[in-house]
Structures are given as C-alpha cells and as structure tokens.
From Swiss-Prot:
SUPFAM superfamilies according to UniProt: Carbon-nitrogen hydrolase
One Pfam family of this chain: LNT_N
HAMAP family referenced in this protein's UniProt entry, alphabetically: Lnt (MF_01148)
Enzyme Commission number, as recorded: 2.3.1.269
The name this protein goes by in its record: Apolipoprotein N-acyltransferase
Record-annotated CN hydrolase domain positions: 215-462
TM annotation in the entry: 5-25, 38-58, 74-94, 111-131, 145-165, 185-205, 469-489
Keywords: Acyltransferase, Cell inner membrane, Cell membrane, Membrane, Transferase, Transmembrane, Transmembrane helix
Family: Belongs to the CN hydrolase family. Apolipoprotein N-acyltransferase subfamily.
Lineage: Bacteria, Bacillati, Cyanobacteriota, Cyanophyceae, Nostocales
C-alpha cells in the first residue's frame, strides 16, 4: 500500500493491497492461530504502509540548519520515522483485532463491518494530532473520478470504497473452494465500475465562471533554504525575493498576492515596517503574508491579510501543528527524548478551531502546511462561507516526495469543498487547482518562481460541506443492524431445528 503514493504513485494497487491482510487474518483465526500473531499481522501491515508512505520524513536529516550534530540528527530522524510508522502500525493492529472477532460471520456482514471499522478508525486517527496517510489519499492526484465521492461524504467515503472492494476480493479467495471465486470477483468489478461512474458524473459537472466572481491571484515561491532562513543572508533574501515577487505580480495585474508559510519570519508587530508591506501601501494590491502572530509570551504560525492601505485586517492561526516538529505530543513522556525541531526559541501554540478569515474579496478558507491532511479544517470553513482556498506551506524540511504528497492532499480538499485553490510554498510545489482537482499550474522544485492565475469564488454547499461525514455513522448503523439481524436469524434457525 505504501507504493500507492509519491514517489512511486502506483495508486491502482490500493484496490487490492489490503486484501492479503484480510485473507491472512480471517484464515489464521479459523486455524486457531494465537491472537498475538494476528495482531502482529496488522501491526506489520500498518508499519509497512505508513513507514513507506512517510519515508520522506527522513529528509530532515541532517539538521545542521538547526545546529544539531550529524549523529544526533540521525538518531532524531530514525526515532521520528520509527514513531510515526509504529503509530500507523497500531491502526492496522487494532483493525486486525476487530476483524478476528467477526471472522466467523457471513461474508457480506464481514465486508460491511470490516469497512465500517476502518472508517471509524480513520475518523479517530484524523481527530488526533498525528495524521497523514488516509487510504483515500492513495488515489490523489491521479484518480480524480473516485476522489469526487468526497463531495458526498468526505474522504471516508473514498476510503470505504477502497476497503469494501478489497474486502470482496479477499472474500472471493476465502470462498474459492465453494466455487464462488468468479461471483465475488464479478461483484467487486461491478462495484468498482459503479463507484467510478458516480465519481465521473460529479467530475464532469460544469464549473460556473463569471467575471463577477473572478479573482486574479499571484503566488511567490521564495525558495529560501532552511539552512539560511533565519540567518542574516536568509532574511535579506526573503525580504528581497518576496518584495520583488510582489511587485512583479502587481505589474501583471493581479488583485492579490499569496506568500508561503513563514515567508517573512517576523512577528505581527514588526510586519508594518517591512519593505513588503511598504510596497503594499504604495501599490494598493492586497497581500496574504505568512509570518508569526503574537499571543502573550507565545507565538502562532499565521497568515495575515494586508489590505490596499497596508493595514492588517485579518489573521488566521495554524491550528494543527506538526508533532515532533512544532510541538512535542505526550511531552511529559517523550519530551526528553526528542529535541524540538522548530528553529524558534519561543513556545508555539495552536490556533483556535473554527476560525474565519475575511478578506476584501470575501471569506476565504485557509490551510497552513500540515493542516492540509485534516479535511474538517477546510470543510468547516467552507460551511462558514469560505469561497476559495488559500494554502500556505513551507515544505522545505523534507525530501521531494513530501511536497508532492502535500499537493495531493490539497487536491482532495479542493474537490471535497468544491472550491478553487491557490497554493504557495517556499520551495515547491506551488500550484493552482480547480474544484475538480485539476492542476492548472504547478511550480518546479527548489526554484524561485512567481505565477498568476485567475480563480473563481464559489458558495456552493454540497452534501459533505453541509453535513460533514454522515456516511461513517450510517455505515456503523447498518453494521449494527446487520449484526442484530444475523443473530436473530441464527436464533430463529436454532429454534426451528429444535421444533423438528
């Protein structure tokens, strides 16, 4: 499963990669294997998936830009990668343990409950601080048709589609001796085609464009390496690069300019004196600037709206911080084992949930870096009236696979919310994406670039934006109903056999 995402992008394997685990767990339970071996199967599968998919985190080594020596840097990197791989492995172990308890149920009920359990676990994991590798993102950016199921009930519906097809394929193998292999494979194929046809129907829906909703946005990709970002030459390069980029885009007729996360590593109180804000006052074109917000003795990672008069009129604070990077989860337990990777000495804090970000062009949906992995951050802002997406990221810490996976996450958020998206990063990949997930333009990697594109403000409210993930509770309810009916039928059959 880990090969389905960048840099391998074998997305089609996702439709069969879970089936072997399903088969091994069910067949091993029937052979009375010890429970520990079944848990180990799930743990191994989970570590394999998340470990391969998130191998890009090893790109943080060497951390000489933080002054960390080579060997300690390697130790920290190995710990971080091992920790997130094991954390993902726990997901697989829990799911495998649940599957063992229904291994004696009928195939249709096993598929229903197995799919529901996976969706519930993804909901729980995504509600926590450490999340990235939903099964749904294995299909992005290549399988745009199936990703449109996200407009109905979010990424969990895409995940349910993948798990259910894998389950039917697995049950085909488990029931092959009963001569049911062909029947199950036909059902799996039919379901796969039907789901893609539904998604394709949504994918081909026309996108309304009008001059009244058009907004020409420019992005500046500063390409400031982390090694120099906070050094004098890095600060000078950032100030010059973003100011010159802003002026270049203004000359191209943009109405607003978006910069990456932490583009100017200054606090809000110092922003008005920067050359970039001075240029905004002079040219009268709005800028969205990534910088740091003040919050008492702490700070936030923020995006600011600077209006045509050079005034800061709105602020969005990053609410999902990077574990082991921007803060230490379970700090009381592991805080002494891992040094903080953030280059700043002050204590970074989470932004509040349910923020709104008003701009001179209407309300926007904002995601800063790691937040792209959390669909609810975007859905809630769309439900609150957000009309377009502004994604601001750094992505300079890791290997090239990470920013491409990050772009894939932003594509999913654009599809789910039915919004146009402008994405500005420090080193790549910056991009513009339409509501169908089509990339209109994408930058190079480790390059300085500016680009302008016209996006459109939208106020549509699809099922997912309006109701959130309603499918997972429905799936759980159907599973409970199926379980209850199965018990009733079994008891009824036993009673009838006694009467005879």
């Amino acid at each position: 499963m880990g090969l389905t995402v960048a840099p391998f992008a074998a997305w089609f394997l996702a439709w069969i990669a879970l089936a072997p685990l399903w088969i091994f767990v069910v067949s091993s339970k029937r052979k009375n294997y010890p429970p520990s071996s079944l848990l180990l199967l799930g743990l191994t599968w989970g570590i394999g998936y998340h470990g391969v998919a998130l191998f890009w985190i090893t790109g943080i080594h060497p951390m000489d830009w933080l002054g960390v020596p080579w060997w300690p840097s390697l130790a920290i990197t190995i710990f971080c990668w091992s920790f997130i791989s094991f954390y993902g492995g726990l997901f697989g172990a829990i799911w495998a343990a649940c599957l063992t308890h229904i291994s004696e149920q009928k195939s249709w009920l096993r598929i229903l409950i197995g799919t529901a359990m996976w969706c519930v676990l993804e909901s729980l994991w995504s509600a926590g601080p450490l999340w990235w590798s939903s099964l749904a993102y294995t299909q992005s950016p290549h399988n745009l048709a199936i990703l449109h199921l996200g407009q109905i009930s979010g990424p969990n519906l895409v995940t349910a589609a993948i798990v259910s097809v894998n389950g039917i394929v697995a049950e085909a193998w488990l029931n092959r001796k009963q001569g049911l292999l062909g029947r199950y494979l036909a059902i799996a194929t039919g379901l796969l085609i039907t789901l893609h046809l539904i998604g394709f129907g949504l994918y081909t829906a026309p996108i309304a464009k009008s001059s009244d909703t058009a907004l020409k946005v420019g992005i500046v990709q500063g390409n400031i390496p982390n090694k120099i970002k906070l050094l004098p030459q890095g600060l000078s390069r950032a100030i010059t690069g973003y100011t010159d980029g802003y002026l270049t885009l203004v000359n191209q007729g943009v109405e607003a300019v978006l910069t990456p996360e932490g583009a100017l590593p200054f606090f809000q109180r110092n922003l008005p004196t920067t050359p970039l804000v001075s240029a905004v006052r002079e040219k009268g074109v709005v800028a969205w600037i990534g910088a740091f917000g003040d919050r008492g003795r702490s700070y936030t990672n923020s995006l600011f709206t600077v209006n045509s008069q050079g005034e800061i009129t709105s602020r969005y604070d990053k609410s999902k911080l990077v574990p082991l990077g921007e803060y230490i989860p379970f700090e009381g337990i592991i805080g002494g084992l891992v040094q903080r990777l953030s280059p700043l000495d002050e204590h970074q804090v989470h932004g509040s949930p349910n923020q709104i970000f008003d701009t001179p062009f209407g309300r926007a949906i904002v995601g800063i870096c790691y937040e792209s992995a959390f669909p609810e951050v975007f859905r809630s802002q769309a439900a609150a009236g957000g009309q377009f997406i502004l994604s601001s990221s750094n992505d300079a810490h890791y290997s090239a696979a990470m920013p491409f996976q990050h772009h894939a996450q932003d594509i999913m958020r654009a599809i789910e919310t039915d919004r146009w998206s402008a994405r500005a990063t420090n080193t790549g990949y910056s991009a513009f994406v339409d509501p169908h997930g089509r990339t209109l333009w994408i930058s190079g990697y480790n390059t300085y670039e500016t680009h302008a594109e016209t996006i459109y403000r939208r106020q549509t409210q699809n099922l997912y934006v309006r109701w959130g993930d309603w499918f997972t509770p429905l799936l759980v309810g159907l599973s409970f109903l199926g379980w209850s009916l199965n018990i009733f039928w079994r008891n009824d059959a036993n009673a009838n056999s006694k009467l005879r």
